[in-house]
Protein backbone atom coordinates (compact mmCIF):
# COMPACT_ATOMS: atom_id res chain seq x y z
CA UNK A 1 0.00 0.00 0.00
CA UNK A 2 1.52 3.31 -1.05
CA UNK A 3 2.05 6.16 1.40
CA UNK A 4 -0.51 8.31 -0.38
CA UNK A 5 -3.11 5.54 -0.39
CA UNK A 6 -2.55 4.95 3.33
CA UNK A 7 -2.83 8.68 4.03
CA UNK A 8 -6.10 8.88 2.12
CA UNK A 9 -7.48 5.84 3.93
CA UNK A 10 -6.59 7.31 7.33
CA UNK A 11 -8.20 10.63 6.35
CA UNK A 12 -11.42 8.83 5.38
CA UNK A 13 -11.53 6.91 8.64
CA UNK A 14 -10.89 10.00 10.78
CA UNK A 15 -13.57 11.92 8.88
CA UNK A 16 -16.08 9.17 9.50
CA UNK A 17 -15.27 8.92 13.21
CA UNK A 18 -15.56 12.67 13.73
CA UNK A 19 -18.68 12.85 11.57
CA UNK A 20 -20.32 10.03 13.52
CA UNK A 21 -19.76 11.83 16.81
CA UNK A 22 -21.23 15.06 15.43
CA UNK A 23 -24.22 13.28 13.87
CA UNK A 24 -25.03 11.36 17.05
CA UNK A 25 -24.82 14.60 19.04
CA UNK A 26 -27.30 16.12 16.57
CA UNK A 27 -29.68 13.14 16.89
CA UNK A 28 -29.55 13.23 20.68
CA UNK A 29 -30.28 16.97 20.62
CA UNK A 30 -33.21 16.60 18.19
CA UNK A 31 -34.61 13.72 20.24
CA UNK A 32 -34.40 15.77 23.41
CA UNK A 33 -35.71 19.01 21.87
CA UNK A 34 -38.27 17.86 19.28
CA UNK A 35 -38.84 14.13 19.88
CA UNK A 36 -38.33 10.98 17.81
CA UNK A 37 -41.47 11.55 15.70
CA UNK A 38 -40.19 14.87 14.35
CA UNK A 39 -36.83 13.21 13.72
CA UNK A 40 -38.76 10.67 11.65
CA UNK A 41 -40.54 13.42 9.70
CA UNK A 42 -37.22 15.09 8.94
CA UNK A 43 -35.67 11.78 7.85
CA UNK A 44 -38.55 10.83 5.53
CA UNK A 45 -38.71 14.28 3.89
CA UNK A 46 -34.97 14.22 3.18
CA UNK A 47 -35.29 10.73 1.73
CA UNK A 48 -38.23 11.85 -0.41
CA UNK A 49 -36.46 14.85 -1.94
CA UNK A 50 -33.51 12.63 -2.84
CA UNK A 51 -35.55 11.78 -5.95
CA UNK A 52 -34.07 15.01 -7.31
CA UNK A 53 -30.74 13.22 -7.62
CA UNK A 54 -32.00 11.73 -10.87
CA UNK A 55 -31.10 15.08 -12.45
CA UNK A 56 -27.49 14.44 -11.40
CA UNK A 57 -27.01 12.16 -14.46
CA UNK A 58 -24.18 10.37 -12.64
CA UNK A 59 -21.86 13.35 -13.09
CA UNK A 60 -20.94 14.02 -9.46
CA UNK A 61 -19.84 10.40 -8.95
CA UNK A 62 -17.99 10.23 -12.27
CA UNK A 63 -15.84 13.23 -11.33
CA UNK A 64 -13.62 11.02 -9.14
CA UNK A 65 -12.68 8.65 -11.93
CA UNK A 66 -12.16 11.25 -14.67
CA UNK A 67 -10.10 13.62 -12.54
CA UNK A 68 -7.93 10.73 -11.33
CA UNK A 69 -7.48 9.43 -14.89
CA UNK A 70 -6.64 12.82 -16.40
CA UNK A 71 -4.12 13.57 -13.64
CA UNK A 72 -2.49 10.16 -14.18
CA UNK A 73 -2.10 11.09 -17.86
CA UNK A 74 -0.71 14.53 -17.01
CA UNK A 75 -3.75 16.31 -18.51
CA UNK A 76 -4.31 18.76 -15.65
CA UNK A 77 -6.14 21.31 -17.79
CA UNK A 78 -8.64 18.69 -18.86
CA UNK A 79 -9.13 17.63 -15.24
CA UNK A 80 -10.16 21.18 -14.38
CA UNK A 81 -12.59 21.17 -17.31
CA UNK A 82 -14.15 18.00 -15.88
CA UNK A 83 -14.87 19.87 -12.64
CA UNK A 84 -16.39 22.94 -14.30
CA UNK A 85 -18.38 20.97 -16.85
CA UNK A 86 -19.96 18.79 -14.17
CA UNK A 87 -20.54 21.80 -11.92
CA UNK A 88 -22.23 24.05 -14.47
CA UNK A 89 -24.32 21.21 -15.89
CA UNK A 90 -25.60 20.19 -12.46
CA UNK A 91 -26.31 23.74 -11.35
CA UNK A 92 -28.58 24.13 -14.37
CA UNK A 93 -30.17 20.67 -14.59
CA UNK A 94 -30.86 20.14 -10.89
CA UNK A 95 -31.93 23.77 -10.50
CA UNK A 96 -34.48 23.29 -13.29
CA UNK A 97 -35.85 20.01 -11.93
CA UNK A 98 -36.36 21.07 -8.30
CA UNK A 99 -39.25 23.54 -8.88
CA UNK A 100 -41.02 20.92 -11.00
CA UNK A 101 -40.64 18.24 -8.33
CA UNK A 102 -42.01 20.32 -5.47
CA UNK A 103 -45.74 19.95 -6.31
CA UNK A 104 -45.31 16.23 -7.03
CA UNK A 105 -43.58 15.57 -3.72
CA UNK A 106 -46.15 17.69 -1.89
CA UNK A 107 -48.87 15.38 -3.23
CA UNK A 108 -46.94 12.30 -2.07
CA UNK A 109 -46.57 13.41 1.56
CA UNK A 110 -50.29 12.95 2.51
CA UNK A 111 -49.88 9.24 1.75
CA UNK A 112 -47.08 9.00 4.34
CA UNK A 113 -48.13 11.23 7.26
CA UNK A 114 -51.21 12.02 9.30
CA UNK A 115 -52.57 15.57 9.65
CA UNK A 116 -50.22 16.87 12.37
CA UNK A 117 -47.01 15.52 10.90
CA UNK A 118 -48.15 16.34 7.35
CA UNK A 119 -48.09 20.06 8.14
CA UNK A 120 -44.52 19.77 9.46
CA UNK A 121 -43.39 17.78 6.41
CA UNK A 122 -44.90 20.24 3.93
CA UNK A 123 -43.35 23.16 5.80
CA UNK A 124 -39.76 21.90 5.50
CA UNK A 125 -40.08 20.46 1.96
CA UNK A 126 -38.91 23.63 0.07
CA UNK A 127 -35.91 24.04 2.37
CA UNK A 128 -34.95 20.40 1.87
CA UNK A 129 -34.95 20.87 -1.92
CA UNK A 130 -32.67 23.93 -1.73
CA UNK A 131 -30.35 22.08 0.64
CA UNK A 132 -30.14 19.16 -1.79
CA UNK A 133 -29.21 21.50 -4.68
CA UNK A 134 -26.31 22.93 -2.68
CA UNK A 135 -25.22 19.48 -1.53
CA UNK A 136 -25.05 18.12 -5.10
CA UNK A 137 -22.87 21.07 -6.15
CA UNK A 138 -20.61 20.48 -3.16
CA UNK A 139 -20.34 16.79 -4.06
CA UNK A 140 -18.60 17.72 -7.33
CA UNK A 141 -15.81 19.50 -5.45
CA UNK A 142 -15.47 16.68 -2.95
CA UNK A 143 -15.22 14.21 -5.82
CA UNK A 144 -12.53 16.41 -7.38
CA UNK A 145 -10.52 16.31 -4.15
CA UNK A 146 -10.85 12.52 -4.07
CA UNK A 147 -9.74 12.30 -7.70
CA UNK A 148 -6.68 14.40 -6.84
CA UNK A 149 -6.02 11.96 -3.98
CA UNK A 150 -6.31 14.80 -1.47
CA UNK A 151 -8.83 13.08 0.73
CA UNK A 152 -7.43 14.71 3.84
CA UNK A 153 -8.68 18.05 2.50
CA UNK A 154 -12.08 16.58 1.72
CA UNK A 155 -12.25 14.96 5.14
CA UNK A 156 -11.52 18.22 6.92
CA UNK A 157 -14.10 20.02 4.79
CA UNK A 158 -16.88 17.52 5.52
CA UNK A 159 -16.19 17.45 9.26
CA UNK A 160 -16.20 21.25 9.39
CA UNK A 161 -19.54 21.26 7.56
CA UNK A 162 -21.04 18.80 10.04
CA UNK A 163 -19.78 20.86 12.98
CA UNK A 164 -21.38 23.94 11.40
CA UNK A 165 -24.68 22.05 11.02
CA UNK A 166 -24.64 21.10 14.70
CA UNK A 167 -23.83 24.67 15.79
CA UNK A 168 -26.64 26.15 13.67
CA UNK A 169 -29.04 23.48 14.96
CA UNK A 170 -28.28 24.48 18.56
CA UNK A 171 -29.01 28.08 17.59
CA UNK A 172 -32.07 27.72 15.33
CA UNK A 173 -33.98 24.60 16.43
CA UNK A 174 -35.13 26.01 19.82
CA UNK A 175 -36.57 29.04 18.01
CA UNK A 176 -37.99 27.56 14.81
CA UNK A 177 -38.25 23.78 15.33
CA UNK A 178 -37.84 21.64 12.20
CA UNK A 179 -37.66 24.75 10.00
CA UNK A 180 -34.63 25.85 12.01
CA UNK A 181 -32.99 22.49 11.30
CA UNK A 182 -33.74 22.96 7.60
CA UNK A 183 -32.08 26.40 7.64
CA UNK A 184 -29.06 24.85 9.35
CA UNK A 185 -28.76 22.34 6.49
CA UNK A 186 -28.88 25.13 3.91
CA UNK A 187 -26.06 26.93 5.73
CA UNK A 188 -24.06 23.70 5.72
CA UNK A 189 -24.59 23.18 1.97
CA UNK A 190 -23.52 26.75 1.17
CA UNK A 191 -20.37 26.35 3.26
CA UNK A 192 -19.45 23.04 1.59
CA UNK A 193 -19.96 24.49 -1.90
CA UNK A 194 -17.91 27.66 -1.45
CA UNK A 195 -15.12 26.21 0.68
CA UNK A 196 -14.96 23.05 -1.43
CA UNK A 197 -14.04 24.99 -4.56
CA UNK A 198 -11.41 27.01 -2.70
CA UNK A 199 -9.77 23.83 -1.38
CA UNK A 200 -9.92 22.15 -4.80
CA UNK A 201 -7.98 25.07 -6.30
CA UNK A 202 -5.12 24.17 -3.95
CA UNK A 203 -5.03 20.61 -5.31
CA UNK A 204 -5.77 21.61 -8.93
CA UNK A 205 -4.30 25.08 -9.64
CA UNK A 206 -5.62 25.04 -13.23
CA UNK A 207 -9.14 25.40 -11.83
CA UNK A 208 -10.42 29.01 -12.10
CA UNK A 209 -11.95 30.84 -9.16
CA UNK A 210 -15.47 30.58 -10.63
CA UNK A 211 -16.91 27.78 -12.82
CA UNK A 212 -16.80 28.93 -16.46
CA UNK A 213 -15.01 26.26 -18.55
CA UNK A 214 -17.85 24.13 -19.87
CA UNK A 215 -16.92 21.58 -22.54
CA UNK A 216 -19.35 19.46 -24.56
CA UNK A 217 -16.72 16.80 -25.36
CA UNK A 218 -16.02 16.28 -21.66
CA UNK A 219 -19.73 16.15 -20.84
CA UNK A 220 -20.42 13.59 -23.57
CA UNK A 221 -17.75 11.25 -22.20
CA UNK A 222 -18.96 11.70 -18.62
CA UNK A 223 -22.56 11.03 -19.62
CA UNK A 224 -21.50 7.76 -21.23
CA UNK A 225 -19.86 6.68 -17.98
CA UNK A 226 -22.67 8.15 -15.90
CA UNK A 227 -25.45 6.23 -17.65
CA UNK A 228 -24.86 3.12 -15.54
CA UNK A 229 -24.33 5.24 -12.44
CA UNK A 230 -27.62 7.02 -13.10
CA UNK A 231 -29.43 3.73 -13.38
CA UNK A 232 -27.80 2.86 -10.06
CA UNK A 233 -29.14 6.11 -8.61
CA UNK A 234 -32.64 5.26 -9.81
CA UNK A 235 -32.65 1.93 -7.99
CA UNK A 236 -30.98 3.42 -4.92
CA UNK A 237 -34.12 5.56 -4.72
CA UNK A 238 -36.03 2.30 -4.42
CA UNK A 239 -33.90 1.37 -1.43
CA UNK A 240 -33.30 3.71 1.51
CA UNK A 241 -35.90 6.39 0.64
CA UNK A 242 -38.58 3.83 -0.17
CA UNK A 243 -37.86 1.94 3.05
CA UNK A 244 -38.29 5.12 5.11
CA UNK A 245 -41.47 6.04 3.26
CA UNK A 246 -42.92 2.56 3.84
CA UNK A 247 -41.93 2.70 7.51
CA UNK A 248 -43.74 6.03 7.88
CA UNK A 249 -46.81 4.61 6.14
CA UNK A 250 -47.01 1.26 7.97
CA UNK A 251 -45.39 2.19 11.30
CA UNK A 252 -45.71 5.96 11.66
CA UNK A 253 -43.00 8.65 11.90
CA UNK A 254 -41.67 7.22 15.19
CA UNK A 255 -40.77 3.94 13.43
CA UNK A 256 -39.03 5.95 10.70
CA UNK A 257 -37.18 7.92 13.38
CA UNK A 258 -35.91 4.82 15.18
CA UNK A 259 -34.93 3.27 11.84
CA UNK A 260 -33.02 6.43 10.90
CA UNK A 261 -31.04 6.40 14.15
CA UNK A 262 -30.34 2.65 14.09
CA UNK A 263 -29.37 2.71 10.42
CA UNK A 264 -27.02 5.64 10.94
CA UNK A 265 -25.27 3.90 13.84
CA UNK A 266 -24.55 0.90 11.64
CA UNK A 267 -23.73 2.99 8.56
CA UNK A 268 -21.22 5.10 10.49
CA UNK A 269 -19.53 1.98 11.83
CA UNK A 270 -19.54 0.55 8.32
CA UNK A 271 -18.19 3.81 6.90
CA UNK A 272 -15.23 3.80 9.30
CA UNK A 273 -14.20 0.58 7.59
CA UNK A 274 -15.44 1.15 4.04
CA UNK A 275 -14.23 4.72 3.57
CA UNK A 276 -10.71 3.50 4.13
CA UNK A 277 -11.42 1.11 1.26
CA UNK A 278 -12.89 3.92 -0.85
CA UNK A 279 -9.41 5.41 -1.10
CA UNK A 280 -8.60 2.67 -3.64
CA UNK A 281 -10.90 4.17 -6.34
CA UNK A 282 -8.38 6.68 -7.76
CA UNK A 283 -5.58 4.20 -6.98
CA UNK A 284 -7.37 1.48 -8.98
CA UNK A 285 -7.98 3.94 -11.82
CA UNK A 286 -4.21 4.41 -12.03
CA UNK A 287 -3.48 0.65 -11.73
CA UNK A 288 -6.01 -0.10 -14.48
CA UNK A 289 -3.93 2.10 -16.78
CA UNK A 290 -0.49 0.87 -15.67
CA UNK A 291 -0.56 -2.52 -13.83
CA UNK A 292 -3.94 -4.27 -14.26
CA UNK A 293 -2.50 -7.60 -13.07
CA UNK A 294 -2.24 -6.24 -9.53
CA UNK A 295 -5.99 -5.71 -9.15
CA UNK A 296 -6.83 -9.29 -8.08
CA UNK A 297 -4.11 -9.26 -5.42
CA UNK A 298 -5.34 -5.92 -4.10
CA UNK A 299 -8.87 -7.36 -3.89
CA UNK A 300 -7.75 -10.42 -1.89
CA UNK A 301 -5.82 -8.22 0.48
CA UNK A 302 -8.84 -5.98 1.02
CA UNK A 303 -11.16 -8.90 1.77
CA UNK A 304 -8.81 -10.39 4.38
CA UNK A 305 -8.48 -7.05 6.16
CA UNK A 306 -12.26 -6.53 6.04
CA UNK A 307 -12.96 -9.89 7.67
CA UNK A 308 -10.47 -9.16 10.46
CA UNK A 309 -11.96 -5.73 11.21
CA UNK A 310 -15.65 -6.12 10.35
CA UNK A 311 -16.61 -9.26 12.24
CA UNK A 312 -15.56 -8.07 15.72
CA UNK A 313 -16.70 -4.49 15.12
CA UNK A 314 -20.22 -5.52 14.09
CA UNK A 315 -20.47 -8.18 16.81
CA UNK A 316 -19.67 -5.47 19.35
CA UNK A 317 -22.35 -3.22 17.83
CA UNK A 318 -24.88 -6.01 18.27
CA UNK A 319 -23.89 -6.60 21.90
CA UNK A 320 -23.96 -2.88 22.74
CA UNK A 321 -27.28 -2.07 21.03
CA UNK A 322 -28.86 -1.13 24.35
CA UNK A 323 -26.06 1.32 25.10
CA UNK A 324 -26.61 3.07 21.76
CA UNK A 325 -30.33 3.27 22.53
CA UNK A 326 -29.56 5.03 25.80
CA UNK A 327 -27.02 7.29 24.09
CA UNK A 328 -29.33 8.47 21.29
CA UNK A 329 -32.85 8.10 22.70
CA UNK A 330 -32.07 8.67 26.38
CA UNK A 331 -33.54 5.30 27.43
CA UNK A 332 -33.74 1.63 26.42
CA UNK A 333 -36.10 1.42 23.43
CA UNK A 334 -36.97 -2.12 22.37
CA UNK A 335 -37.88 -0.98 18.83
CA UNK A 336 -34.53 0.73 18.35
CA UNK A 337 -32.59 -2.29 19.71
CA UNK A 338 -34.46 -4.68 17.41
CA UNK A 339 -33.80 -2.53 14.35
CA UNK A 340 -30.14 -2.05 15.24
CA UNK A 341 -29.59 -5.80 15.63
CA UNK A 342 -31.27 -6.56 12.31
CA UNK A 343 -29.35 -3.85 10.47
CA UNK A 344 -26.04 -4.98 11.99
CA UNK A 345 -26.56 -8.41 10.44
CA UNK A 346 -27.68 -6.99 7.07
CA UNK A 347 -24.97 -4.34 6.67
CA UNK A 348 -22.40 -6.74 8.10
CA UNK A 349 -23.04 -9.00 5.12
CA UNK A 350 -23.12 -6.08 2.70
CA UNK A 351 -19.75 -4.68 3.73
CA UNK A 352 -17.89 -7.53 2.04
CA UNK A 353 -18.97 -6.31 -1.39
CA UNK A 354 -17.00 -3.06 -0.87
CA UNK A 355 -13.71 -4.27 -2.46
CA UNK A 356 -15.58 -5.44 -5.57
CA UNK A 357 -17.74 -2.30 -5.67
CA UNK A 358 -14.87 0.18 -5.46
CA UNK A 359 -12.63 -1.82 -7.81
CA UNK A 360 -15.42 -1.72 -10.41
CA UNK A 361 -15.68 2.05 -9.95
CA UNK A 362 -11.95 2.48 -10.46
CA UNK A 363 -11.84 0.31 -13.59
CA UNK A 364 -15.08 1.66 -15.05
CA UNK A 365 -17.01 -1.65 -14.81
CA UNK A 366 -19.87 0.03 -12.97
CA UNK A 367 -22.54 -2.02 -14.74
CA UNK A 368 -22.15 -4.81 -12.18
CA UNK A 369 -22.60 -2.30 -9.37
CA UNK A 370 -25.76 -1.19 -11.11
CA UNK A 371 -27.05 -4.77 -11.26
CA UNK A 372 -26.53 -5.08 -7.52
CA UNK A 373 -28.54 -1.91 -6.87
CA UNK A 374 -31.28 -3.04 -9.26
CA UNK A 375 -31.71 -6.24 -7.25
CA UNK A 376 -31.67 -4.35 -3.94
CA UNK A 377 -34.12 -1.71 -5.11
CA UNK A 378 -36.59 -4.07 -6.73
CA UNK A 379 -36.62 -6.49 -3.79
CA UNK A 380 -36.88 -3.71 -1.22
CA UNK A 381 -39.82 -1.99 -2.92
CA UNK A 382 -41.80 -5.17 -3.65
CA UNK A 383 -41.06 -7.08 -0.44
CA UNK A 384 -41.30 -3.90 1.64
CA UNK A 385 -44.86 -3.23 0.52
CA UNK A 386 -45.87 -6.88 0.85
CA UNK A 387 -44.33 -7.55 4.27
CA UNK A 388 -45.22 -4.06 5.50
CA UNK A 389 -48.89 -4.72 4.68
CA UNK A 390 -48.74 -7.96 6.70
CA UNK A 391 -46.38 -7.19 9.58
CA UNK A 392 -46.10 -3.40 9.76
CA UNK A 393 -42.77 -1.68 10.40
CA UNK A 394 -40.97 -4.94 11.24
CA UNK A 395 -41.96 -6.39 7.87
CA UNK A 396 -40.51 -3.36 6.07
CA UNK A 397 -37.27 -3.71 8.05
CA UNK A 398 -36.94 -7.42 7.20
CA UNK A 399 -37.53 -6.67 3.51
CA UNK A 400 -34.78 -4.03 3.64
CA UNK A 401 -32.35 -6.54 5.16
CA UNK A 402 -33.19 -9.31 2.68
CA UNK A 403 -32.76 -6.96 -0.29
CA UNK A 404 -29.44 -5.63 1.02
CA UNK A 405 -27.86 -9.05 1.56
CA UNK A 406 -29.14 -10.51 -1.73
CA UNK A 407 -27.80 -7.68 -3.90
CA UNK A 408 -24.43 -7.79 -2.13
CA UNK A 409 -24.02 -11.54 -2.61
CA UNK A 410 -24.72 -11.22 -6.33
CA UNK A 411 -22.06 -8.50 -6.74
CA UNK A 412 -19.45 -10.53 -4.84
CA UNK A 413 -20.20 -13.72 -6.78
CA UNK A 414 -20.00 -12.00 -10.19
CA UNK A 415 -16.77 -10.15 -9.37
CA UNK A 416 -14.99 -13.25 -8.07
CA UNK A 417 -16.14 -15.30 -11.06
CA UNK A 418 -14.86 -12.64 -13.50
CA UNK A 419 -11.46 -12.58 -11.82
CA UNK A 420 -11.19 -16.35 -11.31
CA UNK A 421 -11.12 -16.08 -7.52
CA UNK A 422 -13.69 -18.73 -6.65
CA UNK A 423 -16.05 -18.43 -3.72
CA UNK A 424 -13.41 -17.93 -1.06
CA UNK A 425 -11.84 -14.83 -2.66
CA UNK A 426 -9.62 -14.11 0.35
CA UNK A 427 -11.48 -16.02 3.08
CA UNK A 428 -9.48 -18.72 4.86
CA UNK A 429 -9.33 -20.98 7.94
CA UNK A 430 -7.35 -18.30 9.73
CA UNK A 431 -10.65 -16.56 10.49
CA UNK A 432 -12.26 -19.54 12.27
CA UNK A 433 -11.35 -18.46 15.81
CA UNK A 434 -12.57 -14.93 15.13
CA UNK A 435 -15.88 -16.22 13.76
CA UNK A 436 -16.46 -18.35 16.87
CA UNK A 437 -15.69 -15.41 19.18
CA UNK A 438 -18.10 -13.17 17.26
CA UNK A 439 -20.85 -15.81 17.44
CA UNK A 440 -20.40 -16.04 21.22
CA UNK A 441 -20.63 -12.25 21.62
CA UNK A 442 -23.75 -12.02 19.43
CA UNK A 443 -25.42 -14.83 21.39
CA UNK A 444 -24.53 -13.07 24.66
CA UNK A 445 -26.02 -9.80 23.39
CA UNK A 446 -29.19 -11.59 22.33
CA UNK A 447 -29.68 -13.44 25.63
CA UNK A 448 -28.68 -10.57 27.94
CA UNK A 449 -29.23 -7.23 26.14
CA UNK A 450 -27.50 -4.22 27.64
CA UNK A 451 -29.83 -1.89 29.60
CA UNK A 452 -27.71 0.93 31.08
CA UNK A 453 -30.58 2.52 33.02
CA UNK A 454 -32.05 -0.62 34.65
CA UNK A 455 -29.39 -3.36 34.74
CA UNK A 456 -27.65 -4.28 37.99
CA UNK A 457 -24.08 -2.93 38.19
CA UNK A 458 -22.52 -6.38 37.85
CA UNK A 459 -24.65 -7.23 34.79
CA UNK A 460 -23.95 -3.83 33.26
CA UNK A 461 -20.19 -4.24 33.79
CA UNK A 462 -20.29 -7.71 32.22
CA UNK A 463 -22.25 -6.43 29.22
CA UNK A 464 -19.80 -3.59 28.67
CA UNK A 465 -16.52 -5.43 29.31
CA UNK A 466 -16.93 -9.08 28.30
CA UNK A 467 -17.70 -8.57 24.57
CA UNK A 468 -14.63 -6.40 23.81
CA UNK A 469 -12.47 -8.71 25.95
CA UNK A 470 -13.52 -11.84 24.04
CA UNK A 471 -13.21 -10.11 20.67
CA UNK A 472 -9.91 -8.50 21.60
CA UNK A 473 -8.36 -11.86 22.52
CA UNK A 474 -9.55 -13.42 19.26
CA UNK A 475 -8.14 -10.50 17.27
CA UNK A 476 -4.84 -10.60 19.17
CA UNK A 477 -4.15 -14.21 18.17
CA UNK A 478 -5.31 -13.67 14.58
CA UNK A 479 -2.42 -13.69 12.05
CA UNK A 480 -3.77 -10.58 10.33
CA UNK A 481 -2.89 -8.53 13.44
CA UNK A 482 0.80 -9.25 12.91
CA UNK A 483 0.57 -8.50 9.20
CA UNK A 484 -1.14 -5.16 9.77
CA UNK A 485 1.44 -4.27 12.40
CA UNK A 486 4.18 -5.18 9.93
CA UNK A 487 2.67 -2.94 7.23
CA UNK A 488 2.43 -0.04 9.67
CA UNK A 489 6.02 -0.49 10.88
CA UNK A 490 7.30 -0.71 7.30
CA UNK A 491 5.44 2.46 6.38
CA UNK A 492 6.82 4.22 9.45
CA UNK A 493 10.34 3.18 8.47
CA UNK A 494 9.86 4.58 4.94
CA UNK A 495 8.64 7.93 6.28
Where do the language-model regions lie?
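N-terminal membrane topogenesis motif
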Residues: 1-23, 77-85, 118-122, 213-232, ...
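Interfacial/gating helices of multi-pass transporter permease domains
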Residues: 30-50, 122, 179-183, 217-229, ...
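Helix-loop junctions and terminal segments of transmembrane helices
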Residues: 57-73, 87, 101, 146-147, ...
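Membrane-proximal transmembrane or re-entrant/amphipathic helices at the cytosolic face
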Residues: 444-495
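Interhelical loop/hinge segments that connect adjacent transmembrane helices in multipass membrane
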Residues: 1-5, 196-240, 279, 283-297, ...
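Hydrophobic transmembrane helix module of multi-pass membrane transport proteins
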Residues: 14, 88-241
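Short runs within selected transmembrane alpha-helices of multi-pass transporters and secretion channels
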Residues: 15, 19-23, 45-49, 53, ...
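Interfacial segments at transmembrane-helix termini and the short loops linking adjacent helices
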Residues: 105-128, 317-354
